[in-house]
Curated annotation (Swiss-Prot):
CDD domains named in the record: gelsolin_S1_like (cd11290), gelsolin_S2_like (cd11289), gelsolin_S3_like (cd11292), gelsolin_S4_like (cd11293), gelsolin_S5_like (cd11288), gelsolin_S6_like (cd11291)
Gene that specifies this protein: VILL
Cysteine pairings via disulfide bonds: none
Stretch list, region Disordered: 762-796
PROSITE patterns assigned to the protein according to its UniProt record, in alphabetical order: HP
Gene Ontology cellular-component terms listed: actin cytoskeleton; cytoplasm
Gelsolin-like repeat start and end residues: 22-74, 146-186, 263-307, 401-450, 521-561, 624-665
Its job: Possible tumor suppressor.
Natural source organism: Homo sapiens (Human)
Family: Belongs to the villin/gelsolin family.
Keywords: Actin capping, Actin-binding, Calcium, Repeat
UniProt name for this protein: Villin-like protein
All copies of domain HP, residue ranges: 790-856
GO terms, biological process: actin filament severing; actin polymerization or depolymerization; barbed-end actin filament capping
């Protein structure tokens, strides 16, 4: 096969090939996400511009089905190698095994992966055609990354901890195990809808959900007609095999080289790893706790070594006794994945050619423009600034485990022995928003820290649960926190008195001033001795009679200007400027005599070049479990989830409005930092963000953001339980199901008869379980339209329906579906689409259009 002819080049997107008769053939796009167990696949993902992160690599995956033979594997391996040769060194290679795919791989297929029986590529036709004469049972597993596997059509396949989908062509019944979480149910439902929409001609199938068997007798009757009567109890839930963060933190780096005819694998280092351990002429294996094996190839390594990368990784896996399905990722020098880079303490893109100036480096010296920060979230995220700090500020000090207000005159004067709450109020695009900073002093007690959190919760309740909460550790204050106090943040090494005043422990005190403007200056008290000095900074030495301003040789004019602002906060005594090297004797006497101190010029702090990463959080047996979401977008934020966004300088924890474990969020963030293989600082700020109240510093990390995305979506409970928000659609479903033709029902006659009889049962019982099918929206029960049957045929006039109060509508018109009574021509004219097209859209999008056009 001529690879170059079939190669999509660097065109962005996803491209998939399947093994067939010892060769690889393209998979039609409509079949993406479906994998046949007796085949191997090659998947190429090329980042799409402008979404792609600058310098992002392509990913090339080799996927092996559980039943794949040697011929299929050989064809896929050879094809992948030839693709790699065509693409060059900017490609990350992956080996994937069915049921154990990497997070990167799973991120391509939303809402889930379908594993199918069969071994012929012709089976792909089953994915693309609209067959309704089908009976199959799918076992659905997973939280963020969902998969569905075809299993035996029997009750023996069921267990209490998973979700099962009985697909009968014209009807799909999702059975939720009693031990499944609300998040798993919602994800399962999303996959069910996706299957229905892709495989049933855009949605021509009803969906039923069994959450409680006792409350869904009709659906259970259908299931028993197909599966037979269940004998005995269900199997217990299968224990989860999730890999927790402690396991992932067990990282070891090995140097792999040849010595004569032997291959030597030498353990080189354990965390924290540094980038300089990797030499460009060598070959390395990085073992992440047996969970994943990375192979790093230096740019000067031999062609033979690079071609042997996978075989060496497989040999390493066998030697370690790891499972054969262990994931393998091969990265090239200069094209490392984000996951690989974050296994190292720091990572510099020193080898990247013609690198443009990064947003943060370029912008940090630019004067802040509040308007741009409000309208350009990406800039706000890079600078970590929601505005210039000129909003309203309220401060409380935690004393006697309660919050005490701090006099505004003393705002910005914090004590290391205390904890503080700082509430910042600002406006963005006409909307009031809040940030609550939880500042923790180094000398604060455990009880005070606990009181800090409980008082923050009380404030959040007082403000209706809309506060963004940022946990800040003394000395690691984020830029916006510093900007709030306009360069006058001073941290005293003491405890605050009951009136918010510092209780002085000494008459001689030394303060270090660091910063060049009102947005980055911090002043901290340090031990009053000569060894605390540093030539790069300015120090204020306060004695009983005078306040010395000591200017180190490495400081500049901006630093001196800020020091003169700070000195007015610290002391009212006479000021005396002292240049390094020209100190009077009394200066050294106050410090207890001369002593060595750092005198070399401080190098600029290097800004880490790590890409942001998004994870779904959960826990297993008390340990944090993360599932990474590659190529993330706002669509990946689900109301039932807690998501962790790691931007390296901050950790955001996004709390979905229906998340059940939100109280664990901060602890999860702390555990994430503690167990991170790169040895992250535990003082990294942790920010709690509530769904619907995201600040621009969070929004800016997403390519696009829709602030109204969640305003019209029905909840999972509304959909399943038939709450008022979905009640009007349930009768429509019942009406359509009542009109199903027995001849179109799949399976034998008895099953069809039982199913039809069950579905013709009382509407009361089905209302709790049947989920709306968009195609059914044009149907009505006879009782609901009897009074308007005459006018429906011709349609009501638009002025009778648009912008009308409920009491002003014609008799018999359903207020929730008033648009339905328009004539077909009026409907097309107003909505720009036919009724069939309109009712095939998602419910929330229908509501949105109806609101805009006056039909709500």
């Amino acid at each position: 096969m001529d690879i170059s002819k079939g190669l999509p080049g660097m065109q962005g997107g996803l491209h998939i090939w399947i093994s067939e008769n010892r060769k690889m053939v393209p998979v039609p796009e409509g079949a993406y996400g479906n994998f046949f167990e007796e085949h191997c696949y090659v998947i190429l993902h090329v980042p799409q511009s402008p979404k792609a992160t600058q310098g992002a690599s392509s990913d090339l995956h080799y996927w092996v089905g559980k039943q794949a033979g040697a011929e299929a594997q050989g064809a896929a391996e050879a094809f992948q190698q030839r693709l790699q040769d065509e693409l060059g060194g900017q490609t990350v290679l992956h080996r994937e095994a069915q049921g154990h795919e990497s997070d990167c791989f799973c991120s391509y297929f939303r809402p889930g992966i379908i594993y199918r029986k069969g071994g012929l590529a012709s089976d792909l036709k089953h994915v693309e055609t609209n067959l309704f004469n089908i009976q199959r049972l799918l076992h659905i597993k997973g939280r963020k990354h969902v998969s569905a596997t075809e299993v035996e059509l029997s009750w023996n396949s069921f267990n209490k901890g998973d979700i099962f989908l009985l697909d009968l062509g014209k009807m799909m019944i999702q059975w939720n195990g009693p031990k499944t979480s609300i998040s798993e149910k919602a994800r399962g439902l999303a996959l069910t809808y996706s299957l229905r929409d892709r495989e049933r001609g855009g949605g021509r199938a009803q969906i039923g959900v069994v959450d409680d068997e006792a409350k869904a007798p009709d659906l259970m009757q259908i299931m028993e007609a197909v599966l037979g009567r269940r004998v005995g109890s269900l199997r217990a839930a299968t224990p989860s095999k999730d890999i927790n963060q402690l396991q992932k933190a067990n990282v070891r780096l090995y140097h792999v080289y040849e010595k004569g005819k032997d291959l030597v694998v030498l353990e080189l280092a354990t965390p924290p790893l540094t980038q300089d351990l990797l030499q460009e002429e060598d070959f390395y294996i990085l073992d992440q706790g047996g969970f994943k094996i990375y192979v790093w190839q230096g740019r000067m390594s031999s062609l033979q070594e690079r071609k042997a990368a996978f075989s060496r990784a497989v040999g390493f896996i066998q030697a370690k006794g790891y499972p054969t399905y262990t994931n393998v990722e091969v990265v090239n020098d200069g094209a490392e994945s984000a996951a690989f880079k974050q296994l190292f303490r720091t990572w510099s893109e020193k080898r990247r050619r013609n690198q443009k100036l990064g947003g943060r480096d370029k912008s940090i010296h630019v004067k802040l423009d509040v308007g741009k920060l409000h309208t350009q979230p990406k800039l706000a995220a890079q600078l970590r600034m929601v505005d210039d700090g000129s909003g309203k500020v309220e401060v409380w000090c935690i004393q006697d485990l309660h919050r005490q207000p701090v006099d505004p005159k003393r705002h910005g004067q914090l004590c290391a022995g205390n904890c503080y709450l700082v509430l910042y109020t600002y406006q963005r695009l006409g909307r009031v928003q809040y940030i609550l900073y939880l500042w923790q002093g180094h000398q604060a007690t455990a009880d005070e820290i606990e009181a800090l959190n409980s008082n923050a919760e009380e404030l959040d309740v007082m403000y209706g649960g809309v506060l963004v909460q940022e946990h800040v550790t003394m000395g690691s204050e984020p830029p916006h926190f510093l900007a709030i106090f306009q360069g006058q943040l001073v941290i005293f090494q003491e405890r605050a008195g009951h009136h918010g005043k510092g209780q002085s422990a000494s008459t001689t005190r030394l303060f270090q001033v660091q910063g060049t403007d009102s947005h980055n200056t911090r002043t901290m008290e340090v031990p009053a001795r000569a060894s605390s000095l540093n030539s790069s900074d300015i120090f204020l030495l306060v004695t009983a009679s005078v306040c010395y301003l000591w200017f180190g040789k490495g400081c500049n004019g901006d630093q001196r200007e800020m020091a003169r602002v700070v000195v007015t906060v610290i002391s009212r005594k006479n000021e005396e400027t002292v240049l390094e090297g020209q100190e009077p004797p009394h200066f050294w006497e106050a410090l207890g005599g001369r002593a060595p101190y750092p005198s070399n010029k401080r190098l600029p702090e290097e800004v880490p070049s790590f890409q942001p990463r998004l994870f779904e959080c959960s826990s297993h047996m008390g340990c944090l479990v993360l599932a990474e979401v590659g190529f993330f977008s706002q669509e990946d934020l689900d109301k039932y989830d807690i998501m962790l966004l790691d931007t390296w300088q901050e950790i955001f924890l996004w709390l979905g409005e229906a998340a059940s474990e939100w109280k664990e969020a901060v602890a999860w963030g702390q555990e994430y930092l503690k167990t991170h293989p790169a040895g992250r600082s535990p003082a990294t700020p942790i920010v709690l963000v509530k769904q619907g109240h995201e600040p621009p510093t969070f929004i800016g990390w997403f390519f696009t953001w829709d602030p109204y995305k969640w305003t019209s979506h029905p909840s999972h409970k509304e959909v399943v339980d038939g709450s008022p928000a979905a009640a009007s659609t349930i009768s429509e479903i019942t009406a359509e199901v009542n009109n199903l033709r027995l001849s179109r029902w799949p399976g034998n006659g008895r099953a069809g008869a039982v199913a039809l009889q069950a579905l013709k049962g009382s509407q009361d019982s089905s209302e709790n379980d049947l989920v709306r099918s968009p195609k059914s929206a044009g149907s009505r029960t006879s009782s609901s339209v009897s009074s308007t049957s005459a006018t429906i045929n011709g349609g009501l006039r638009r002025e009778q329906l648009m912008h009308q109060a409920v009491e002003d509508l014609p008799e018999g018109v359903d207020p929730a579906r008033r648009e339905f009574y328009l004539s077909d021509s009026d409907f097309q004219d107003i909505f720009g689409k036919s009724k069939e097209e309109f009712y095939s859209m998602a419910t929330w999008r229908q509501r949105q259009e109806k609101k805009q056009l006056g039909f709500f």
